[in-house]
Amino acid sequence: MAIAASAMCLFLVAMFVTLLEGLICIVLVVPVFLVAGSLGGLVGGAIHNAKGTNRSTLPALALLPFLFGPIENAMPHQRSVETVTNTIHIGASPEVVFDQLADVRAIKPNELGFSFVHLIGLPKPVEAQMSGTGLGAVRTSRWEKNVWFQEVITMADRPRVLQYRFVVPKGAIPRQALDEHVEINGDYFELVDGGYTLERSADGGTELSLTTRFVNKSRLQIYGNLWGKLVLKDFHGSILGLMKTRSEIASSALPSSALLQHPVKKLASEL
């Protein structure tokens, strides 16, 4: 079993070194490969011990992955809609927090904190900029590696709700920017919609929640859901941390009277 697992690790290292797969893809498949390699080693060892040494047995077993490959490719892609939500407490009023959501300029890497998905190569957000007014306004998010996409506003009620649907124009995701297994609106995952909800807490601060819905189109639904949710939760954590930092800085810069008298307006009349 140890030999099989070691062989799998060497195979994955070779895939990365020869640039056949990116680091993101390697990290995604490591658990599956290690489990499959270990099980394969156990089965192969059991067959070897039961039947003794046979020169034709090992080559026959080695051909099994190639025989099952076409069967897997022939299986239809399944689809499931999944939802991920993260919440953070912010020491600023909902009005102040809401005003930080539309335009998020010049994001510095240190503002995002540590993120596992960014560590393995997922591009970091650079800025988000709102264009237009009211419902139908477009918030354009730009990431590293020239990745960008749009969020079309579907509901805006300051300081309670900001919702949007995702739009990924053709050419917005450079082919080399993301591994195909985590590509936005690629063969495996598709972003549907999302948004922020804000609730005033007892201390006058804000409970800010970020929700994203995505479609899992992979054949391995359970595994795809696991990684899809892990990636989004990690990304949500970075964005919510950024909103917390900027909102609390903005709140501390306001005079007390402004915090108490801040009007509640509709985004439609403000943008």
Regions found by a protein language model. Name each.
Residues 1-2, 33-37, 59-61, 119-195, ...:
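Glycine-rich portal/gate segments that line the openings of hydrophobic small-molecule binding cavities
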Residues 2-48:
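Membrane-embedded alpha-helical segments of integral membrane proteins
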Residues 93, 145-146, 158-159, 201-205:
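Short strand-connecting beta-turns/loops that link adjacent beta-strands
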Residues 211-236, 259-264:
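C-terminal/domain-terminus segments
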